[in-house]
């Protein structure tokens, strides 16, 4: 909106921006207090590209290898390597034949990811009918079957099942209740990889804040909004502890 010439004021409840992506700095150490995984880097790239910039203009990104390590209740561990080829080799080593399933699964996951990113998330989210399009109609069974059902049909090793079900847990959902279409997150995980921002996730927040300020956005911390002022069907302003805007 600021880029289009509108006056924009951002009212922030806390003393700093970021919300859950805040950072604790103590004794020379920095701790991410919320999100730690930098997934789906292409979406962040698109955001900065809208303003003629790149994420690397603001912070240093490093792809993690291994991406992460899963520790099971029995004490077993699986360190997930970076890159589809390496992950496929790991699956094949643990369960011969599972690599073939994984390759097919990830190609389907990539298609779902591209569909979601390029066509679905651009919609306003006002109706479930926004999901109806040729790309989703042909995948209707994936909306009525769970991702756990699909994974457990293709992989027998319990540990590998848990690895493939992890992205659903990452979304805060149960794999048994998550539509199989959301296998798209497996592509985000194994295809696009897990990245780390040098200095922590707060660097992304700081980059967005700098960008907003360069566009003329006025940012007011310590301004909790108490009420949205509505007249008729129109929002006329917001009431805070420090005045009305």
Model-assigned labels for residue ranges:
Residues 1-114:
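N-terminal glycine-rich phosphate/pyrophosphate-binding loop and immediately adjacent elements
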Residues 11, 162-164, 220-221, 240:
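General beta-strand structural signal in soluble alpha/beta enzymes
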Residues 11-14, 179-183:
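Active-site-adjacent bridging/hinge elements
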Residues 17-19, 171-172, 227-229:
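Flexible loop/turn segments at secondary-structure boundaries
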Residues 73-75, 240-243:
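Glycine-centered tight beta-turn/hairpin loop motif at sheet-sheet or coil-to-beta transitions
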Residues 73-179:
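Rossmann-like flavin
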Residues 184-241:
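Helical element adjacent to the flavin cofactor pocket in flavoenzyme catalytic cores
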């Amino acid at each position: 909106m600021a880029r289009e010439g509108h006056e924009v004021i951002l009212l922030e409840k806390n003393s700093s921006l970021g919300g859950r992506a805040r950072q604790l700095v103590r004794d020379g150490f920095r701790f991410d207090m919320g999100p730690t995984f930098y997934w789906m880097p292409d979406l962040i790239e698109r955001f900065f590209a809208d303003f003629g910039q790149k994420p690397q203009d603001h912070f240093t990104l490093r792809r993690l290898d291994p991406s992460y390590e899963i520790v099971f209740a029995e004490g077993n561990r699986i360190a997930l390597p970076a890159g589809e080829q390496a992950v496929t080799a790991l699956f094949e080593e643990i369960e011969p034949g599972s690599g073939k399933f994984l390759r097919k699964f990830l190609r389907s996951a990539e298609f779902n990811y591209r569909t979601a990113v390029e066509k679905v998330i651009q919609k306003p989210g006002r109706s479930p009918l926004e999901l109806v399009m040729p790309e989703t109609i042909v995948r209707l069974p994936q909306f009525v079957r769970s991702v756990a059902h699909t994974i457990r049909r293709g992989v027998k090793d319990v540990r590998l099942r848990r690895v493939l079900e992890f992205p659903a847990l990452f979304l805060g959902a149960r794999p048994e209740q998550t539509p199989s279409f959301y296998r798209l997150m497996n592509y985000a995980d194994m295809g696009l990889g897990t990245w780390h921002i040098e200095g922590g996730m707060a660097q992304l927040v700081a980059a967005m804040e700098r960008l907003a300020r360069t566009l003329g956005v006025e940012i007011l911390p310590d301004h909790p909004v108490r009420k949205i002022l509505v007249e008729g069907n129109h929002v006329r302003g917001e009431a805070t502890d420090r005045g009305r805007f």
